[in-house]
Amino acid sequence: MLVKTRGVILKEIKFRDQSKICPVFTEHFGKISVILKGVRNPKNKLSGVFSTGNMVELVIYKKQNRDLHLVSDALLLQSPMSARPDMERFTTIYQLIETLKQVTGSEEPHPVLFRFLAATIEELCKPERDYQLVLAWFLIRLVTVLGFEPELEQCVISGEPLIPAAEAMAPDENLYFLFDPGGIAFAGPSALIRSEKRALPALSFRLLRWLSRQNIDALPDIRIPEEHPRRLCELLQDYCAVHIDHNPPVRNRRIISQIRPDNT
């Protein structure tokens, strides 16, 4: 059956002399693998279209009970890696793709998640953005769509409202993010829990809650020290990892930390 859908390229795998295989997270079919015959020939019209991180519209011959589907045609929609070189953008896209590869199962459609992903890719194509802030915006929606949205309104242990107390706290005064049950707790009650938890400065918490309630087009209006979006990205990636059947990609995290601009 010939079908059309949008998708984000998760990986490129060389196949034989001129072809390649790509896992793609698609709008209508979830994660599938496609084969592009002869695409590594520079004269092929699809050469360069199926690069990791690209958003494409693709036409495929999709067959039931097959793990590999042949691409008939494709159109490049967005290419965040082809924009002006930016190391922070590169590392953010790498984090995004690695997270998607972990949490998406084969042929499990997530149309709502794809809509958030499409908005994120579009924002990552723009210059002079806080790319880690964009990723944090996506990750809080990812965990919500996957069914383990953290509690951000009241302490997950005591039930006490978080907002009045958090707004009165100094920016570097800590709350705690508990992985199980997922959500925020005050320092006192969190001491009773033995499951994994992370200290979270009050300002980082307020940012997390703000991100959970805002459209992506509000992000350029906020100015906040870069360590807070970065902290949220690391926290939410780890939170994802403990709620799925995969182990955290420790090696990949080390690579990211080594290539960040502030480590060069």
From Swiss-Prot:
InterPro entries: ARFGAP/RecO (IPR037278), DNA_rep/recomb_RecO_N (IPR022572), NA-bd_OB-fold (IPR012340), RecO (IPR003717), RecO_C (IPR042242). SUPFAM superfamilies: ArfGap/RecO-like zinc finger, Nucleic acid-binding proteins. It comes from the Bacteria. GO terms for biological process: DNA recombination; double-strand break repair. Keywords: DNA damage, DNA recombination, DNA repair. One of its GO terms (cellular component) is bacterial nucleoid. Belongs to the RecO family. Involved in DNA repair and RecF pathway recombination. This is DNA repair protein RecO.
